[in-house]
């Protein structure tokens, strides 16, 4: 849609959007005042977003203002611009005001102007940067590290050894009161679905610590071996957070399993991790439905299960003979209630959590988090999302995925409060919780935002306490995120992209930089990015271009092992070198724009991201090839829509005979969807089907899916190639 420039907009243009005459007249007067008083489009947009726009105005008017303001501006429209005074009060701003000249010398100017230089400093001076951040986070070591980074000279571990010699316990760091907080600070605010008109529940640091200690004592009473793997397959609620911290405090290793998994998927993860026990819930309550969870754990032939009731104090079904109810489990340590549990301090490289890639029919990668990974999560939150004491951080997620543990560490280590809604995040009850819990940092994924906008489920709720949004999981859409910003009076969206194997992000945004929608403004602190050209050579720094993203191998908190795979082969083998260092593979296609922003373009290999779940093309093709006898072969392609947003699944079909050249593609699409959802994942959906006389192939007969992706992106999803 073509938008008028701001000075061309008339009262009738505004009225055409459904705004009354009187209101339209006032809006136009205010707009004219702003235009006359501003010199640049960003300055104009700042004033419009502060003085004119509010959530009750039609979104079409927000779009008229945004696109009208930046008409003829070019790419990368700034949707949010930092205020220098506010920027100086952020975590990084305060640090730079105090020590900027020490770090950057005469090049230091102010937190906003010097942030990019500070990011580069964090890469070139890891000893100084990470020691500073660990001090800012008040990280407690029972034995301090000999140094920050011990680089590898053998070539076996290109990422080097971080914090060598250090001993610590991440859970202890979550539960310690110090200069960042007091024992009476509220550290969890939560609400159960169905109790939406009741006050928000709260838990203080003192209460959380007491309950974690009790659960850790009860774990010790089970008599498990040291450093046993213990699974958690539960919704993200207060009990699961207590359990997670207790496992880590006791020196065991959490095995993260998503509460949506089938018995087969649960079983696979239990076997890979060699879990000795599992915490689960009897059922998951969503509205008037009770979804079985313990039953799936039993069908997975799980080891000893400790079962938490979803409601009340007793489970809804009979347990297996050796399984324990939550109450009976805690009862084993009833005499130790209120007694401190002395944390099990472990080496920095010891495992604390086993997480998994989102494998479907293939075996998922088992990725161990060490005791350093939680520090990376907390440091990212400190720097990029500016999480501080007094913040309430909410992020709809699950302990089965990395953002669950991330939320625990990002909030508690930074002295903030977690906001947990035990229910669906898609409807108005979650929006009400955000209001009532006074959430200040709200994490989202684009598909949730799309649902909110389409259902108007946030209408009428006050989100003015929000300071910033975080977004992860999949590519976002510009207009959907413009709408999201408008719900909170144009607070920024910080895009956050990394991976389970990173422990956080490698690319993000910052509250010290202008933020463009659906774009990243900076490499994460301590990370250096490379965009590779067609010959796998890094393009010049700061040059615009598109290519596969590679990473500097030295990343604090990143993985160095896989339980069921060759880590070097997966992440380093075959990668180019830069200044004598082999680069780390990530696998996404990224664009660096002429203005220095980054945009994600999906997977560079034959993997795609569907609704935040990575899946291989071959897995989908195997299903589609057997759907109909007329199909010779298929290619599954993830294609980003023209307006941005999550990849859409397109199936390119080659038929066995020319007589099938005009089939009913809608019927075929329904068949593909039915089989894919049955055999792979109920959340996967085919967006369109296209026909081809043959698939493009390399000289070695490999399907060139990247070529198909480029053609589909250029011609549109419904074209016949």
Curated annotation (Swiss-Prot):
Tissue specificity of this protein: Expressed in leaves, stems and developing seeds.
InterPro entries for the chain: AMP-bd_C, AMP-bd_C_sf, AMP-binding_CS, AMP-dep_synth/lig_dom, ANL_N_sf
Hydrolase is among the record's keywords: no
Keywords, sorted A to Z: Fatty acid metabolism, Ligase, Lipid metabolism, Peroxisome
GO biological process: fatty acid metabolic process
SUPFAM superfamilies given in the database record: Acetyl-CoA synthetase-like
UniProt motif (Microbody targeting signal) ranges: 719-721
Effect of gene knockout: No visible phenotype under normal growth conditions.
Enzyme Commission code(s) on record: 6.2.1.-
EC primary class: ligase
A GO cellular-component term linked to this record: peroxisome
Family listed: Belongs to the ATP-dependent AMP-binding enzyme family.
Name this polypeptide is given: Probable acyl-activating enzyme 17, peroxisomal
Gene source species: Arabidopsis thaliana
